[in-house]
Regions:
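Amphipathic, Lys/Arg-enriched alpha-helical "gate/interface" segment within cytosolic domains
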Residues: 1-144
């Protein structure tokens, strides 16, 4: 795990096998490509599967389209292949991100990647079977 350098908006909790992604500002193709690369590197490096949590609460703009979301979803489905099941929870309140998350969930149905979109952090924590504190941003971080 220590071979992979994670971007500032990504955390990996080895003890609970959970990747947490917190995009800030604009969510665009560059941001999505970056997290896809990180997930791919972790999947290649780690021996055990891990769940994902995308917290889009700090995203204030979206520059994506359905064609791109479809391509990403089909790519992830194909690349993940027949690996063990994994969960991907997307916390979203922005209507565009909710719709894109639901498209991603639909296109990964039937694969080992189980995607659900949540508007409530507590529900996401319950589905992922992790303490809600692990999904809550650290307000004491370097945001001063």
């Amino acid at each position: 795990m220590n071979k992979i350098r994670l971007p500032p908006d990504v955390e990996f909790h080895e003890d609970i096998r959970l990747l947490v992604y917190r995009p800030r500002g604009l969510v665009n193709k560059e941001a999505v490509n970056k997290i896809i690369t990180v997930i791919g590197e972790l999947e290649t490096t780690l021996k055990e599967p891990f769940d994902r949590f995308s917290d889009t609460a700090a995203a204030d703009a979206v520059d994506l389209n359905f064609e791109y979301i479809i391509r990403v979803s089909l790519y992830r489905r194909s690349v993940y292949g027949n690996r063990p099941p994994t969960k991907s929870a997307i916390l979203a309140t922005d209507s565009t991100l909710i719709h894109y998350g639901k498209v991603h969930a639909l296109l990964t149905q039937g694969s080992p990647i189980k995607v659900r979109v949540f508007q409530d952090r507590k529900e996401a924590a319950q589905w992922l079977n992790v303490p809600i504190e692990r999904l809550t941003p650290n307000s004491a971080s370097s945001e001063t």
